[in-house]
Amino acid sequence: MTTDQGIHEHIAALVAEEKSLRDQLASAQITPDDEHARLKALEIQLDQAWDLLRQRRALRETGGSPDDAAERPASVVESYLE
């Protein structure tokens, strides 16, 4: 997942899993508690992936190497103001 394409693919996989969870809940294959817990984890992973893409773009735009970007911890990414 060290390229923009790889990050986008990871995001797509997370979104697909999110949809699958909602479908599983609708068909009573999982409990609402299970869905909620997994969705929260997916949201954090998505926030981290989008943050990494933004870092890479910012580095590229300022003459830096996008490879210097690093995934930030959930505690950092989740404390950003929208």
Task: Put a short name on every predicted segment.
Residues M1-E82:
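Extended, charge-rich alpha-helical interface modules
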